[in-house]
Amino acid sequence: MFCIIHFGNPKNDKFLGSSTLYSQKLKTNNIKILCLQVFYYNIYESTNNNNNNKNKNKTLLLNNIRTYSTLSKGALSTTTTATTKKMSMDDSFELPTNLNHFLSYVPSLEYHMHKGQCGRIGVFGGSAEYTGAPFFAGITSLRLGADIVHIFAPSEGGTATAIKTLSPELIVHPLDQQMDPSTIIPWLLSIHVLIIGPGLGRSSIAWKSAKEVIKAARNINLPMVLDGDALRLICEDLELVKGYDKVILTPNFVEYRALSDAAKKLNNDNSNNILSPSDLAKALGNVVIVQKGQEDIITDGTISYSCDKAGMPRRCGGQGDVLAGVIGTFYAWTQNALKGKTSEELEHLKESIGENQSAAASAAYAGCVLVRYAAKLAFKNNRRSTITDDIIKSVPNALVWGFLTDDRGRPTI
């Protein structure tokens, strides 16, 4: 049991010094009180100013205590005033029953398999300001179980070099100053899914290149996940994705509103209403929409899912990039599960997943569920200090314990 203590109302810094980080464990009736990140605070006040007695009769001044455990009665001195706030975080997880069919898409690991069969993912994005975004999406894909990830990022500002440095396991393709799409397009035939947008920025050069890449990907029927600034880009030309049922759009609140306005303009709708996710998906020709928020709504206009499982209250930059990487990988798995199957095998798969299930929508829904669970695990261990890297490190456990356990709760391969 432990308490996190915040000391307030500093009078001076005699005891700590002006910038000392004070960490000390105090044992009080089997409760460990952990003092963290205390600056400019006078922790002890002597009842006697005599230097010879400065270490005697010290009184611990507790201005406020926030605890994640219930304090035992009488554990603190009766002379100490404290307020407590109980907070708990259960790490249990139960896969939603309407996702059971998704397990049919998850590839089994076999010794005869070769590299690439569990997913080859492409990520196009990054800029001088946002180097981390494509890295987060790419490394999440690898941690989830994709075999190969290609990152297409600009050389300008050292973006591509920085990503290479962050992970030698990512295959990084530096783009020239014009971000020539001809550097990317030849690789599209060798990947299963292309994620466009993480950290892309809004420069005219980046957008021009992204438009050409989207067109090329659509021409070869390549599944895509569009996130971040790629969503802003298509708001200027919705025909880039309209009617393409192999694209998943993952807007946050602001991006969703922009997409809704663009769709209404395209369809001559002058109302002030924001389109529902289902109506937006239909207006764009049944693309898959993932409306991110406190409750994620996933729909292709025909079938809809909602994900309101508890994640974490902490918000840190990069969570959307993690989600894009997870959805991209799950989408690749669904597509690969359908490839090379005989008509009899496809019929059996259709029976196991259900007649009306959308592979793309299922992948997006499963991605939302998994990322929330990973965030929950990360927050349990790191609390307020949780960063995106902590969530990524929790992805493997979220996958195994959330999705890949047998009836006895044992992890499957």
From Swiss-Prot:
Q: Could you tell me what this protein is called?
A: ATP-dependent (S)-NAD(P)H-hydrate dehydratase
Do you know which Pfam families this protein is assigned to? Answer: Carb_kinase
Q: What class of enzyme is it?
A: lyase
Q: In the Enzyme Commission scheme, what number(s) does this protein have?
A: 4.2.1.93
Q: Where does ATP bind?
A: 292-296, 311-320
Top-rank taxon: Eukaryota
Catalytic activity, reaction form:
(6S)-NADHX + ATP = ADP + phosphate + NADH + H(+); (6S)-NADPHX + ATP = ADP + phosphate + NADPH + H(+)
Describe the task this protein carries out.
Catalyzes the dehydration of the S-form of NAD(P)HX at the expense of ATP, which is converted to ADP. Together with NAD(P)HX epimerase, which catalyzes the epimerization of the S- and R-forms, the enzyme allows the repair of both epimers of NAD(P)HX, a damaged form of NAD(P)H that is a result of enzymatic or heat-dependent hydration.
User: Which of this chain's residues are annotated to bind (6S)-NADPHX?
Assistant: 199, 252-258, 321
Signal peptide boundaries: none
A GO BP annotation: nicotinamide nucleotide metabolic process
- Where does the YjeF C-terminal domain lie? 98-402
Which SUPFAM superfamilies does the entry mention?
Answer: Ribokinase-like (SSF53613)
InterPro entries under this entry?
Answer: Carbohydrate_kinase_pred_CS, CARKD, Ribokinase-like
Keywords (A to Z) from UniProt: ATP-binding, Lyase, NAD, NADP, Nucleotide-binding, Phosphoprotein
Q: Which cofactor does it need?
A: Mg(2+)
* GO MF annotations in UniProt: ATP binding; ATP-dependent NAD(P)H-hydrate dehydratase activity
